[in-house]
From Swiss-Prot:
Record-given protein name: Transcriptional repressor RHIT
Keyword line: DNA-binding, Isopeptide bond, Metal-binding, Nucleus, Phosphoprotein, Repeat, Transcription, Transcription regulation, Ubl conjugation, Zinc, Zinc-finger
Zinc finger extent (C2H2-type): 306-328, 334-356, 362-384, 390-412, 418-440, 446-468, 474-496, 502-524
Function description: Transcriptional repressor involved in regulating MPV17L expression. By regulating MPV17L expression, contributes to the regulation of genes involved in H(2)O(2) metabolism and the mitochondrial apoptotic cascade.
GO annotation terms (biological process): regulation of transcription by RNA polymerase II
Lineage: Eukaryota, Metazoa, Chordata, Craniata, Vertebrata
Length: 550
């Protein structure tokens, strides 16, 4: 007696058991009605329930395979035919199917029916799910069990019970191998259809899923279950095929399935996911494929076809060109809801809004200074490492920031494209122009949290905060004197080197600081009284002793 006949008999007995009174109760209630609760292991040992022995294993089967078969797990092999059984009545036979003896009493029949009901609610093996699960039993599983078994089926054999299969569909796919209608194979299918059994070959299953348009997901599942199959035109491993070398190239099963199953007027896609075209396109290389749609991209992808009409800069995407044009038109469609500042890009607005929240999640591990942006932290860390990745191509001077390099290159070209519309002053950077325009508007958006003084530039606020903290981070390497501003250190170092870069255009006198030059120029332009006051101030400065180094 085969496992299929035993499963059918169990299904028939289960249908008769449903007609008995009390079948609508749960498994626990049925067992409690018949002499109390019976453990599952003892129930299988009932004298009126006999276990059908398994078929003997063929010769050549390993001990590991036999052990897996004893546990109810049968490994699937490539090239074998698997049976998807839709049994009537929702029966769920296992490798060892309980078969009711004809002399069994009604009580034992009720117990067996209850056990069969409990069987459908118990965790079952992959053998049961893959080969003997009916549609009715599949519908009884909850969402978690369906997801679990669907994942198992996808990993093990590529089968999925989520597709609404129909007998004519499979019959049409199985047929077409050169067999005439009414052949012995078709008659065998009709006999198995009476029992609810449909026999499907794995290769035919691959072709059917490919015809359904699910070749992408099926290929990924079959690749995980049986190892990645060779791609189109790819040679198989030397140990997999013992035939001649000319037969090593394996055709693509998905492409063949599409050619066989598609109508004559259907335009098939040129490429499939994971299947590269055998002949490259124009240009010598195959075009890349889209991972989302499975369609080949345009051969022109990667080229910068969108060109700016004003500056000639080219872009690969039209959206990038639209964003770039805003640098010429000055359009800033993204406005900050807190301060009203506008930006040309939404990413710049997001970065700006962190200033209002005061959040500084990025901390330097060397000095523990915090920053609101990760890019600012990276630029700051170059101060500790001394890294200067940006090099001027004309004078080989290096910079830690790209913006500093752009500013420096303006000294070579002399180009100042950013012009102030009020006074006509030009600048090399747009940020410098924005800072300059605050001198006309009087806007000072950076207030000091200690004294409330406002500044037009953030750098001036940082320097001002040192007057409250007393911090002097700039040290002279010659005398050790410290300063709160880098400009003060630069002017001080000129006293050691004797450099006086500021000269008076009238008398030629030189000075080490620009402020001293401005004071000197008033001597030539001021009246006698102002000149006397300047001379007295200069004499007092010369008579005063130099400040002691700190």
């Amino acid at each position: 007696m085969s496992a299929d006949d035993g499963g059918i008999r169990a299904a028939q007995d289960k249908e008769r058991a449903r007609e008995t009174p009390g079948h609508g109760h749960s498994c626990q209630e049925m067992l409690s009605e018949s002499e109390g609760t019976v453990p599952l292991g003892e129930a299988w040992e009932s004298p009126h329930i006999k276990m059908e022995p398994e078929e003997p294993h063929p010769e050549g089967v390993s001990q590991e395979t036999r052990a897996e078969g004893a546990r109810g797990w049968v490994p699937l092999s490539q090239g074998t035919k698997e049976k998807v059984c839709f049994l009537p009545g929702g029966a769920l036979p296992a490798p060892q199917t309980p078969v009711l003896s004809r002399e069994g009493r009604t009580r034992d029949r009720q117990m067996a029916a209850a056990l069969l009901t409990a069987w459908s609610q118990m965790p079952v093996t992959f053998e049961d799910m893959a080969l003997y699960l009916s549609r009715e039993e599949w519908g009884r599983l909850d969402h978690t069990q369906q997801s679990f078994y669907r994942e198992v089926l996808q990993k093990r054999s590529g089968l999925s019970l989520g597709f609404p299969f129909s007998r004519p569909f499979w019959a049409s796919q199985v047929q077409g191998k050169g067999e005439a209608p009414g052949s012995s194979r078709q008659l065998g299918h009709e006999e198995e259809e009476k029992r609810g059994v449909v026999e499907v070959d794995k290769e035919e299953l691959a072709a059917s899923l490919g015809a359904l348009g699910d070749a992408k997901s099926f290929k990924s599942r079959m690749g995980r279950a049986q190892g990645e199959a060779p791609r189109c035109g790819q040679r198989a491993a030397s140990g997999q095929n013992s035939g001649p070398a000319k037969d090593d190239v394996q055709p693509c099963p998905v492409k063949e399935a599409q050619l066989e199953s598609a109508p004559p007027d259907t335009d098939l896609p040129k490429t499939q996911e994971g299947h590269f075209p055998e002949q490259p396109r124009e240009g010598g290389t195959a075009a890349p494929e889209s991972s989302e749609e499975g369609l080949a991209l345009d051969s022109e992808a990667g080229k910068k076809t969108y060109k700016c009409e004003q500056c000639g800069k080219a872009f690969s995407w039209h959206s990038h060109l639209v964003t770039h044009r805003r640098t010429h038109t000055g359009e800033k469609p993204y406005a900050c809801t807190d301060c009203g500042k506008r930006f040309g890009r939404s990413s710049h607005l997001i970065q700006h809004q962190i200033i209002h929240t005061g959040e500084k999640p990025y901390t330097c591990p060397s000095c523990w200074k915090s920053f609101s942006h990760h890019s600012t932290l990276i630029q700051h860390q170059r101060i500790h490492t001394g890294e200067k990745p940006y090099v001027c191509d004309r004078c080989a001077k290096r910079f830690t920031r790209r913006s500093d390099l752009v500013t420096h290159q303006g000294t070579h070209t002399g180009a100042k494209p950013h012009k102030c519309p009020i006074c006509g002053k030009c600048f090399t950077q747009s940020s410098a122009l924005v800072t300059h325009q605050r001198t006309h508007t009087g806007v000072k958006p950076y207030p000091c949290p200690e004294c409330g003084k406002c500044f037009s530039q953030r750098s001036n606020l940082i320097a001002h905060n040192r007057t409250h903290t007393g911090e002097k981070p700039y040290h002279c390497l010659d005398c050790g004197k410290s300063f709160s501003h880098s400009s003060h250190l630069t002017a001080h170092q000129r006293t050691h080197r004797g450099v006086r870069p500021y000269s008076c255009p009238l008398c030629g006198k030189s000075f080490s600081r620009r402020s001293n030059l401005h004071r000197h120029e008033k001597i030539h332009t001021a009246g006698p009284k102002a000149l006397a006051m300047l001379m007295l101030g200069a004499a007092g400065t010369l008579a005063a002793p130099p400040p002691a180094p700190t």
